[in-house]
């Protein structure tokens, strides 16, 4: 009888992200199969050729150069047939700490991750980046864009850890812009008067489960919903729609 990872977790009594895996749509090797109708090439006009991709990381501390990257997740975005920006696909990986990485006990207590748990099924940084970047690059191409731009809640933090991992692995095909980002802290502060994700998400009328918070996949998906909600409300207020008339590139 074959025992699934989920059954192993249940039998071991392990709980939470420290032992588990991302949901079934995440954490598997990317096959390259993507629906050609999922992404709208008009998205390329919306952000001057950049595809927003929401990223969240969970880490062993605050210093991207010295502290471990433990989880990374990404959510691609697309334009639907009504011109609204919506989440498209989600991807995530558990990551093995790089050699010599710092693991701050306070950070691990905060995010609930046990980096040594045998059922994490974590990958090396390079393998995790490869698995995550492949579908991001495919989404960029399908959307008619030239590059991905990272969206995050405190985006400088997530981009810092992504860039540090890319540098450690000498990774040559990073799909993300090296320094430009969209930050939902700023956007939600402006639109909702809230800068904390756990407060901004409910304020925007989006469900929030504190028991799943501080997992990279969950936080990335909720950040994606928040980003889309703010942008779509801005559109409904009568803001210009650049995907219809891109105008001059200045």
Q: Where do the protein language model's features map onto the residues?
A:
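Histidine/lysine/aspartate-rich catalytic loop segments that bind and position anionic ligands
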Residues: 166-168, 175-190
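Active-site-proximal helix-loop-helix substrate-binding element of RNase H-like nuclease domains
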Residues: 95-111, 115-118, 184-221
């Amino acid at each position: 009888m074959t025992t699934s990872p989920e059954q192993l977790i249940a039998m071991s009594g392990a709980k939470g992200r420290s032992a588990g895996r991302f949901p079934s749509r995440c954490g598997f090797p990317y096959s390259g199969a993507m629906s050609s109708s999922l992404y709208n090439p008009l998205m390329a006009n919306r952000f001057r050729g950049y595809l927003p991709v929401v990223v969240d990381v969970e880490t062993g501390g605050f210093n991207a150069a010295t502290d471990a990257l433990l989880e990374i997740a990404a959510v691609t975005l697309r334009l639907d047939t009504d011109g609204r920006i919506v989440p498209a696909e989600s991807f995530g990986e558990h990551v093995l700490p790089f050699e010599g990485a710092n693991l701050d006990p306070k950070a691990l207590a905060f995010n609930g991750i046990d980096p040594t748990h045998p059922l994490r099924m974590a990958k090396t940084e390079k393998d995790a980046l490869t698995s995550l970047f492949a579908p991001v690059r495919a989404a960029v191409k399908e959307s008619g864009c030239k590059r991905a731009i990272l969206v995050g809640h405190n985006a400088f933090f997530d981009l810092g850890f992504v860039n540090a991992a890319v540098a450690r692995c000498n990774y040559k095909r990073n799909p993300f812009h090296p320094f430009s980002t969209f930050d939902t802290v700023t956007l939600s502060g402006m639109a909702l008067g809230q800068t904390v994700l756990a407060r901004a998400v409910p304020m925007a009328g989006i469900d929030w489960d504190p028991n799943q918070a501080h997992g990279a996949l969950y936080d990335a998906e909720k950040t994606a919903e928040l980003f889309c909600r703010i942008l779509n409300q801005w559109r409904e207020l009568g803001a210009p729609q650049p995907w219809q008339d891109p105008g001059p590139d200045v």
